[in-house]
Amino acid sequence: MLLYNTLGRQKEEFTPLRPGKVHMYVCGITAYDYCHIGHARSALVFDVLVRQLRHMGLDVTFVRNFTDVDDKIINRANKEGLDWREVAQTYINAFYEDMDRLGVQRADVEPRATDHIQEIQDLCAKLVAEGKAYATTSGDVYFRVRSYPPYGKLSGRSLDELLSGARVAPGEEKEDPLDFALWKAAKPGEPSWESPWGPGRPGWHIECSAMSESYLPLDIHGGGQDLVFPHHENEIAQTEAVCHCHLARYWVHNGFVQVNAEKMSKSLGNFKTIRDILESYLPETLRFFLLGKHYRSPIDFTAEGMDEAEKALHRVYTALLETQKALTREKWKKSPLPAQLTEDWAAQAEALDEAMNDDLNTAQALGHIFTQVRLVNRLLEDKTLRAAEAGRDLLQDFLARAEQWNTRLGLFGQQPEAFLADLRRIRAARRNIDIPRVEALLQERQEARANKDFARSDALRQALLDLGVSVQDTPEGQNWDLE
């Protein structure tokens, strides 16, 4: 498998440091607000990466942390008159709810910063002892950036470039504007812990170094592209300065999310939480949308893009439903399928594997899935092919492949009939279509057809079309969908 390594700035063959085992650490949320679409993308990317590694037969230990003490958490607690621990727990619970809805599997280990205060202090003490960090008279501890010559190797930034934008805030006792905080001296009204430098709390960067320490060296360290600098750059410096080993062999970062071609921000009024989106769309639609673009590419969140994802899911689930029906009603004949159809079917499974092994190219993998759906639809639409025993085998293989796609991508795993009903419901809600009214018209039309009142049946079909509802008559009865 090839993975793009931010450190080497190229795709590299993935080789675990320990045969058959993978240690992977991904930076999780700072628990002060509901997760937005950027959090969803990062979570989904690394969820699929873990799934793919396990599909390859590797034993993966996946660690994803929670930052549960931070300036943003403290500020929110003070603003709302709450205990900071209550704020953190509220949004950790919300994270789990959102991720469960999106089908994101839980990490194997989920450390919290406040459970590792001793490890954080121990790491700070080692850095001070080795001259890589220093304590100030006010009780802050800073990392000496110039003490780590490779600083900037991940982001590709030079010290001169960084120095031009560095500042020392009033009251800070930094030796150098480049230095960053490992331990912050206590302030009135803030949580703090006793330490060798006086009461205080950890800086953001040191938390991840301490929480990942017992899994070193890591095979993969991941996160969003926004974490490359300064967070991951600082993690490398403070960890490698004392462990004298590589923090991680592969650094994997997912691209940014924009909303309607603009940066997502509360000030622009386009800030989209996962919960906002799932009021109007099914969770699987958001999952499909985010996996429909290569993970390193930027993605633009639009209603049009979500509508297209919805249509794509409709095609796949409709093919799955029609396949299930065909397998229960057909009488099979001993006849082969066209050689080209059989060859194309076999080739697509291999092509999907190649896409997933080429830097987790989910966009290309989904393209191969839709090629398979087209092949299945071609078979279903041809009575001769559909009734062939070889056709039955292909349809059964289609259902088996869909189960594998669900295992690897977290898609197409629901019961087709139930999913399509949920899809109709949520699309109808977006369009303010009254489903009980639709169902009443369908019932009336069914009665008209039973009474052979075809003029009335046609009038009711038109009434449904005027509502945006199409009706298809089948041997099993009426099927309806939204136009």
Curated annotation (Swiss-Prot):
The first-level EC class reads: ligase
InterPro entries for the chain: Cys-tRNA-ligase, Cys-tRNA-synt_Ia_DALR, Cys-tRNA/MSH_ligase, CysS_C, Rossmann-like_a/b/a_fold, tRNA-synt_1_cat_dom, tRNAsynth_Ia_anticodon-bd
**Entry GO CC:** cytoplasm
Source superkingdom: Bacteria
Q: Name one GO biological process term.
A: cysteinyl-tRNA aminoacylation
| Residues that, per the record, bind ATP | 266
Report if keyword Calcium is assigned.
Answer: no
Principal place of residence: cytoplasm
EC assignment: 6.1.1.16
* Reactions that this protein is recorded to catalyse: tRNA(Cys) + L-cysteine + ATP = L-cysteinyl-tRNA(Cys) + AMP + diphosphate
- Name this protein carries in UniProt: Cysteine--tRNA ligase
Q: What taxonomic lineage is listed for the species of origin?
A: Bacteria, Pseudomonadati, Thermodesulfobacteriota, Desulfovibrionia, Desulfovibrionales
Gene giving rise to this polypeptide: cysS
